[in-house]
Amino acid sequence: MTNSVRASALALASILLTGVSLGNANAADQQVQRGKYIVSIISCTDCHTPGTFLGKPDMARYLGGSDVGFEVPGLGVFYGSNLTPDKDTGLGNWTKAQIATAITTGHTPDGRILAPPMPVQSFKNLTKSDALAIAAYLKSLPPVVNKVPGPFGPTQKPTSFVYQVIPADKYVPTPPPPGK
């Protein structure tokens, strides 16, 4: 093989390998953008960004954990956790697969069950691709150091009762006023 043919082959191989690398980067960017879109439409900000429930979301701590708790009768008070990749107060030690599993099953990597305000029942039918896209987006965020309070209450390991926020025997519907 002549030097010019060898140089041409080497140049072509470099171009092709760069293309593969760029293709992988583009696919990763698309996955992150898909995750950003899904996080937006399912309103993760509502429960996981400080100040949102007070009408002033603190975007400097975007998805860094809530400062407003949710009381679940009989179980206690729970706060939206820090979803950023901070290793001490967020999801920094979780893999994308572990995040996707938690979103769709309600189980954390250490076996705990996510707090009842987390709408796992709504997310259990997400495709694996969409759950991993959410995880990729969360891992792409800047880490926010924010340890949320709690949980507080009689138990830290909710049982199957978790989705019954108001027990059926305690719920009394209020009829509409006459004429409405």
Where in this protein do the model-derived segments appear?
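Short, intrinsically disordered, charge-biased short linear motifs at domain edges
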Residues: 28-35
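Short, cysteine/histidine-rich loop/knuckle motifs that typically chelate Zn2+
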Residues: 46
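Local sequence-structure signature of Cys/Sec-based thiol-disulfide redox active-site neighborhoods
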Residues: 36-42
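Flexible coil segments in periplasmic/lumen-exposed cytochrome c-class electron-transfer proteins
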Residues: 30, 41, 49-78, 109-180
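Bacterial N-terminal signal peptides that target proteins for export
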Residues: 1-12
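A structural feature that tracks compact, well-ordered secondary-structure segments
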Residues: 88-97, 101-107, 120-123, 135-137
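Sec/Tat signal peptide C-region and signal peptidase I cleavage site
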Residues: 21-27
